[in-house]
């Protein structure tokens, strides 16, 4: 199952719960959520999806990632900025994107092109 959610500012948690409730989880199917705004990840009930893929933050746009340090201007904020995150049994991958938002600047946080290989553990 592939479910997509656009950006929702207010009422994010209620919106996601209603959206996921509209589509019954199919037994023996992987359930992926394409979530524009990674901040909504914390509002997803544990086990509601197998993987959340997100973007929105552009990886923080400014940071020290290019120097080998996992730090961006968003590191201490509530926003998951880039990479893999876990909350209970839920997993989130935030893509850094290739461009920028707002001010035309990207320093120390390179864009990325990702290739993901999903392997389903059939024992679960």
Where are these regions (language model features)?
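Soluble catalytic domains of enzymes that build or remodel membrane lipids, polysaccharides, and related
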Residues: 1-124
